[in-house]
Every structure is written in C-alpha cells, then in structure tokens.
Amino acid sequence: LKKITPEDGFHEIIIFNSGKYFIDSFSSLKVPKKILIKSLPNGELVHSIDETDLNQFVNYEWAFPKIVSFPSRDGKVNLDGKIIFPPDFDSSRRYPVIIHGYGMPGTQIVKNQWSRVWHQYLAQNGFIVFSMDSRGMGGRGEDFKNYSYGDISKYLAEDHLAGIDFLISS
C-alpha cells in the first residue's frame, strides 16, 4: 500500500466514476479545510478547489485544540479527548468547562480536524471546551465500537465521568 494523502489531518475522499481522480477534502487541528482534486493512483495534485485562509482567524485569537488520552474508570481502555483552552489561559485560574458529549455508535468527535467555530467562540469567551469519545464510538476499530452493542448507555455515563475525573486531576 502507498499513502497518497500525505497531509496531516482527517481526510474525506470521493473517487470520480472514471477512477482516474479523487476529491480530497481535509483539515487538521492547525490547518483549516482544503478541498483538492488529485489523480489516481499516485495522489498528484491536479487542482485546488478551495483553501481556507488561516489569516482570517488571526483577529479571533483562534485557540488550537489539544488531543489528550486518559484511562476509563474500569481501566480497560484509554479514551480520547480534545480540549480547547481560552486564548489567555492561565493555569492558576479556575474556568467554567463546557463538555461536548455525544456518544452514538460509530461516530467520532475527537479527530485531527479543524475545530468547530462554536467551540472557539466559547473558548474566546472564557470557557474550557472538552469533547471526548466514549466506548462505542467510531474511529478506533470494531472492538472499541462494539462495546456499546446491545446497551448504548452501559459505558456512556461512566466514560464521561472518567473524562471529568481527567479534567479535575489536570
């Protein structure tokens, strides 16, 4: 196998019916969305459809998220979280925390992808924004996703409590 999307981040691919080209729509924690047309089989850039200008965010004190990992309460798995701190964050101060939880099977919140504008707005207004993936969510393999099979709520609350434990201990 040869990787043909070398750019860091989360990629969504659409292959043309001809099989000769594909659209690569991607972003990362530090790079806003880009949409490119690339050729197959080598991934060579053919055309840039759209590229978000990072400079437009300078006046907004865009806070880059940090991906973290912490143990579940039962110690069976490590869970992933994403934290956005206020731009002027001072570790000696206390801040209100907004927890963005979802937890539906097969979905994934924590990924190397440009963050939501709403979360940035909250951070710029003095909130710490914490998102996490509980057991049963996607992007971590079939075994991790199947934790919620037959009982979606079994780990959801416990895993979110582990996230809160992590925040308190940090």
Feature names for model-found ranges:
Residues 5, 12-170:
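Serine-hydrolase catalytic core recognition
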